[in-house]
A protein has these predicted regions:
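Intrinsic disorder/low-structure terminal segments
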Residues: 2-3, 112, 166
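Catalytic core of non-heme Fe(II) oxygenases with the double-stranded beta-helix
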Residues: 12-14, 24-117, 129-133, 140-149
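Intrinsically disordered, low-complexity regions
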Residues: 3, 38, 160-163
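Non-heme Fe(II)/2-oxoglutarate
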Residues: 124-181
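A glycine-rich, hydrophobic loop/mini-helix early in the fold
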Residues: 1-16
């Protein structure tokens, strides 16, 4: 469920995402000056539902097209599953011994990381299991090259939220910003 849906249907979640005290806490945790992603980023604040057997996300980096770093914050909401967040620390670092963590995201569990640097996955959901996580994204620099914004929008449209959700929102955001033209 994208940021756009949460804005309309769950404003309290968006208020938490934007709360100055919460952002200050995360900045202290990461050692970075953080800010929310721009309003045209559907991943900035999103709910991810795992409800069908086999639901998972394979190993990946949270590739960011922002000019600065992007930090991912996961907040466990529902954890009735054997599914785990698997993190492989020090992947491709010849100076350090690789280490794997498998983390349950029980309700209230908060996990923060730089998604561009952490190789991670969510293991497959079992039968009659359910997992729901709130994902919050924060950046050190919210600017993005226009070509990378287009690529990011296409990825979001086809891999995550659907064409209508991504591009309808982009058009309505532009119209609101430029009502006369």
């Amino acid at each position: 469920m994208s940021f756009y849906t949460l804005q309309a249907e769950a404003p309290t979640i968006v208020a938490l995402y934007r709360a100055p005290a919460f952002i200050e806490f995360l900045a202290a945790l990461t050692g970075q000056r953080l800010q929310p992603c721009p309003d045209n980023d559907p991943h900035s604040c999103a709910l991810y539902f795992y409800t069908e057997p086999g639901d998972h996300i394979g190993f990946h980096f949270d590739t960011s097209y922002y000019r600065g770093a992007r930090y991912t914050v996961l907040l466990g909401l529902i954890e009735r599953s054997s599914s785990r967040l698997v993190c492989q620390l020090f992947k491709d670092d010849p100076q350090r011994q690789p280490r794997e963590l498998q983390l349950a995201t029980h309700p209230g569990t908060l996990i923060a990381f730089n998604g561009d640097k952490l190789w991670h996955a969510v293991t497959p959901l079992g039968v009659d299991e359910e997992r729901v996580s709130l994902t919050l994204e924060y950046v050190t620099d919210p600017s993005m090259h226009p070509a990378k914004r287009l690529f990011s929008n296409l990825k979001d449209a086809f891999a995550y939220f659907g064409i209508k959700a991504v591009f309808r929102r982009s058009r309505s955001s532009k119209a609101a910003a430029n009502p006369g033209g």
